[in-house]
């Protein structure tokens, strides 16, 4: 049985990105604010995502690749390495790459996809 995967956006990514992704990709995307994760540590977020099991974290944070590499998946991770940018620029970048990254993570044993 295939899980219905969700993408959880880290606190450093605007909830507006979640809204756009939900509307345009068909992927369930939730912001850290909608999940009440915005005041938690990275480890706490990792543990909550791990407990759910069908989560892909989307983050610019350098701590998440280390956590997933050290502790394993779930959760899986899309690690953004594009620097600071406004929401429109970030959405334009994600629009080009998110479907392929999602497909790789949900259909293979790959735990981390880095987008740069």
Where are these regions (language model features)?
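Intrinsically disordered, low-complexity and often Lys/Arg-enriched segments
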Residues: 1-5, 116
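N-terminal first-folded block
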Residues: 6-55
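Histidine- and aromatic-rich ligand-binding microenvironments
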Residues: 10, 36-50, 61, 82-98
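Conserved beta-strand termini and adjacent loop/short-helix elements that scaffold enzyme active sites
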Residues: 32-34, 60, 80, 115-116
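Short, hinge-like loop/turn segments at secondary-structure boundaries
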Residues: 47-49, 74-77
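Acidic, metal-binding active-site segment of PIN/NYN-like and related structure-specific nucleases
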Residues: 49-50, 54-68
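Histidine/acidic-residue-rich catalytic or RNA/ligand-binding cores of hydrolases
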Residues: 69, 73
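C-terminal structural segments of small proteins and small subunits
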Residues: 75-115
């Amino acid at each position: 049985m295939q899980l219905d995967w969700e993408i959880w956006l880290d606190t450093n990514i605007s909830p507006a990105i979640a809204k756009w992704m939900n509307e345009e990709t068909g992927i369930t995307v939730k912001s850290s604010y909608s999940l009440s994760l915005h005041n938690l540590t990275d480890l706490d977020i990792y543990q909550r995502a791990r407990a759910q099991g069908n989560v892909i974290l989307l983050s610019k944070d350098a701590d998440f690749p280390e956590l997933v590499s050290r502790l394993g998946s779930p959760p899986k991770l899309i690690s953004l390495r594009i620097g600071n940018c406004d929401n429109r620029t970030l959405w334009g970048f994600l629009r080009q790459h998110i479907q392929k990254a999602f497909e790789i993570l949900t259909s293979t044993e790959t735990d981390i996809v880095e987008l740069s």
